[in-house]
Amino acid sequence: MLIDVNSSEAILLNLVNGNADVVGDPTRKAIQDGEYGRIPRRELDQLIDRKYLFSNSDAATSYVQSVEKSLIAQMEELPPSFVYIPSYSCNLNCYYCFEKAYDHDTSLPDQGSCSSAKAFLMALKTIVCSFEEAHRTELDPKDISVTITGGEPFIPENYSAILTLLKGCRNLGITPSFVTNGYFLEPFLPILKEFGVSDIQITLDGSKPIHDSIRITKAGDGTFDQIVRSIEALDEFAERLSVRINATKKNLPSIADPSFSKLINEYPNVFFYLYFMQQEGCADRKNVLNELEGLKTALRIQECCSDLKNLDISYHGENIVRPIFGHGAFRPKIAMCAAMSNQYIFDYTGRIYKCWWGMGNPDYQVGDFSMSGHSINRKLESPYRLRKVTSIPKCSRCRFRLICGGGCTGRLSRQDFSLGRTICPDFESILPFMVRHLYQSGENHARA
């Protein structure tokens, strides 16, 4: 991909291996015209060495296929990862909650919730042991991810189940992470400290007036002040505390409020980031921003408000853009996420799922578990495991496939998912815009 960054330079971006190089105007024009003989020999050799150019189309195809084959093998070696839902009950009533897209049981957990937590831990151990036997390896417990979410995990009725999970995970050498709204954290703080929980995500949707119109209690009360108190408490011991701002048409302008940037700067060790919502509750999209326009708006606000420099902006394609400017390494994706590999989601009702978007929906169930054991229906699981860019016709023809990994399946129906349909980000617009923006704003450290 050739991206003009000014009148005399372009960045040549390899969409397979992530290599990026600044080229001058003569080379840019030669590449655009397909007349590679006009490129100086030394520079041409560099382009060949870095896999931009090949002697023929068969050599190019062979290289891409070898990369994809390696990625498939690597994906099969990924350690199992787990999500547990102690209940679907929540103390908030956010209009955009994706769990509102379908009906499921939001009643408070009963006395059986601890038994379900214990059954989950048993299943986790069995799955890990089976993986180790199949791959003839011994996993480091630190490489096994367990995320506890909901609903809302930190409601009073979940306390016993959370304690059971923390004890069980510690016995296995695992420290779980949590996704929470942060509203009712205080009673849980002592056990979170005791068990060394350091990875927690909270959501805060803009300045206080806007947040308090979006993330409200069931009674309609605002939650901003209470969540900020939770951030303050967690900042004392949670080393990987992140605060997500779900950006929509409703709240994006509010990040320009000076009080919001002041809040961000009060907690320099906390990772605050913008995430552009893809859909709202019941699959509505009336407040969903076009991602490119959202990026432009967010960056304009950030440029005008210097105090917002610590606010990160998440976007599709950042996995290849950020490494160009020295932030991390590009990791091509043969599939979208861990749901296409060894991720399993367990809920307190005894059901097992693969994808976050399907949890709580029986139509997306792939197995069940209890104190007697667990069972995974391989036929129901297979569409996930088989979904790779090499097996989706549209993806196999797309040059962005190893950036995207086939796209998120969460918004697809089960039938569309099985048919290999896709929902594609606008990489054709987003990548040039972000590369150009970062280069022109001074992060011109593209690898040469």
Model-based region annotation:
Residues 86-93, 340, 395-397, 401-402:
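Cysteine-centered iron-sulfur cluster-binding motifs in ferredoxin-type domains/subunits
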Residues 8, 339-342:
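Short loop/turn microsegments at loop-to-beta-strand junctions
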